[in-house]
Amino acid sequence: MTRAWAIGLFLILAASSASAKSKKCTVRVHGQGNENDGAVFATPVTTPISGKNIFIEKIATISEHDVSAYRPYAASDGSFGALLQLDDHGRLALDTLSVERRGSTVLVFVNGRIATELFIDRRVSDGQIFIASGLTGADIASMEKTWPQIGAKKRK
């Protein structure tokens, strides 16, 4: 009988903790790698917009931990876009990436899929990443659960 109570209590706690977890948004920014780096450091990918076959670094330069706020947009094709505001660490990482990798491609992954590709043609020191389109309503909903909107008042 005690065993049945323990199992029942465990199932109730497991179910409540599983339902309490909301899906957070993941963002990864990967710089273009070198095919000579090998499979440990770079992986081949076909870019969605230009269709180029490139190698990207397996380690992301910027992640969702570097994002401090966002602003969603409705794109003309019916999807969504977003402006991501980076914190100080993300701003420095983006600035460094844009200086060191000028002339290369950067891929932005949102929730595990490629949202956009960016070509680095100048220094980016404002700490903002713009995703013009290609995001779904679920992506925006997960962003809403993860970060505040740019310019929104902080909750007390």
List each model region and its residues.
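N-terminal signal peptide c-region/cleavage motif recognized by signal peptidases
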Residues: 15-17
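Hydrophobic alpha-helical segments of integral membrane proteins
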Residues: 10-12
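Bacterial N-terminal signal peptides that target proteins for export
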Residues: 1-7
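Structural signature of multi-pass, alpha-helical inner-membrane proteins
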Residues: 20-156
